Amino acid sequence: MEKFQGYLELDRSWKHDFLYPLIFQEYIYAFAHDHGLNRYILLENVSYDRKYSFLIVKRLITRMYQQNHLILSANDSNQNEFFGHKKNLYSQMISEGFAVIVEIPFSLRLISSLAGKEIVKFHNLRSIHSIFPFLEDKFSHLNYILDIRIPYPVHIEILVQTLRSWVKDAPSLHLLRLFLYEYHNWNSIITSNKSISIFSKGNQRLFLFLYNSHIWEYESLFVFFRNQSSHLRSTSSGALLGRSYFYGKLENLVKVFTKDLPVILRFCKDPFMHYVRYQEKSILASKGTFYLMNKWKYYLVNLWQCHFSVWSQPRRIYINQLSKNSLDFMGFLSNVRLNLSVVRSQMLENSFIMDKPIKKFDTIVPIITMIRSLTKAKFCTVLGHPISKPVWADLLDSDIIERFGRICRNLFHYYSGSSRKKSLYRIKYILRLSCVRTLARKHQSTVRAFLKKLGSDFLEEFFTEEEKVLSLILSRDFSISQKLYRGRVWYLDIICIHDLANHS
C-alpha cells in the first residue's frame, strides 16, 4: 500500500471517496501487472506475450457507455480487434484494474481499524498456516463439525449490490456492473458452445474480491452472534476473517433479525463454537450434540436463501464426528485421534499404572490426492510411477532441475506441519526420478547413465531447509535430529495453495 499513497495524495477525488477517476489512470494498470503485487508467490509469473496499449483500455471503457454496443453480429465480432485474439488480454487488464482500485479503500480502512488494537504481526494472520495452530488448540476439544461448501451467487448483480454499502461512488459501481455484463455477453457471442465464466483464472483477483465481500456479509453475523452470546469476546476472530483479499468491517455490524434476535442468540449461544473458512469451504465446529449441529445446518441454508438470495441445499453441508471421520480441508486430511499415555502413580508402598487418553489434532498428507495431482501435471502415472515431462525437455538442464526442485521444496514447505511425513518422501522420489527421466529424454540417454553424470549436486536441489539443518546436527546429536524430524512446523509466509497443474 505504500506505493499507492503517493498517487492517492495527488487525487483530490480520493478525499471524497470517488474512485471513478482512478480507472483512467495508467499507473493503476501498471500496478495490477506488477510482480511485486502478485500475491500468488508459489505460482510462476507468466508475462504477456503480446504488447498492449493503455489507450485501448480507455477506449474500451468508453465503448461500454455507448448505446447499442450489444448489437453485434458474429461477422462483426470476427472483424473487431477486441473480439479477436486480444479479447482476453484487455478484458483481464480492466478486471485487474477494477480489483486494484476497489481494494484501496478496504485496505486503508483495515489498517486504520487495526491501528488501536494490539495485534502482533497482523500480516502473519494472512498466512494459510495461521489457521492450523488455531485448529490444533481448539478442535481437539470439540465433538462435531459442519463441513460446509459455500454456495456461489446465482447472479452477478448480487455481487455488485454487496459493494453498495461499502463504496459510495456510484459511477464506479455502474462501470463495474457494465463491465461484468459486457464481458459475459462477449463470451457468449464468441463461444456459443463453450461458455467462458467471468470467474475464470484470468479474472481471479476481481472474482476473489467480489466473492469475499459477499461472504463477509453473512460471516459478520457469526461475529455479531458470538460477541452478543459470550462475555469473553474474541479479538482474533476479526483477524482470522480478514485474510488475503478480504477486508472486514467489524465496527459496522449488520443490523438483522431485529424481531427474532433474542431467539437466535439463545440458539447460537455456544461458548465452544468455532468458525474457519478458506475460499469456498468453511468449517463450523462445536462441542455440542448432533441435534444442535443439525439445527445449525438448516439455519445456514435458510439464511442463505431468505436473506442473501443464494440458493443452497442441505446436502452441501455434512455433519462429521471428529473422532470417527477425517476432514479434508486445505490439502490436509485432519482428524482427532486418541493417544494413550501411560501414567504411573505411587502412594506409599502401592503403585498404580493408568492409561490416560489424550486427544490430539492430527494432520496427514493425502497421498492419493497428491498422486492424482502429479498425474494431472504429467509427472507420474495413475499408479504413481514417475514419467518424463516432454513439455520441459526443450529447456536448459539447470532450468529443468530448478523447476522440479522448486516444486518439491514448495510441497515440503507447505506440508511441514504434517504429523506423518513418509508420504512426502514418496512424492520427492517421484519428482526426482521424473526430473532424471526428463533430462535423459532430452539427451537421449538412460536414467542410470545420467544419474552418474549428475552426481550429488543434483540431489541438493531437492533438499529442503529442514533437511539441511538435520544433516548438520545428525552426527552430533541423533535424539535432537529425530525430534526435529517428527516436529510439526507451520510457516507464516504461505498465502495460497500451490496447484501443480499450473506448472504444466
Swiss-Prot record:
InterPro entries associated with the record: Domain_X (IPR024937), Maturase_MatK (IPR002866), Maturase_MatK_N (IPR024942)
Organism: Simmondsia chinensis
Protein name per UniProt: Maturase K
Gene Ontology biological process: mRNA processing; RNA splicing; tRNA processing
Alphabetically ordered keywords of this record: Chloroplast, mRNA processing, Plastid, RNA-binding, tRNA processing
Record-annotated membrane-spanning stretches: none
Record's keyword annotation contains Glycoprotein: no
Keyword Membrane appears in the UniProt entry: no
Subcellular location: Plastid, Chloroplast
Family of this protein: Belongs to the intron maturase 2 family. MatK subfamily.
GO MF annotation terms: RNA binding
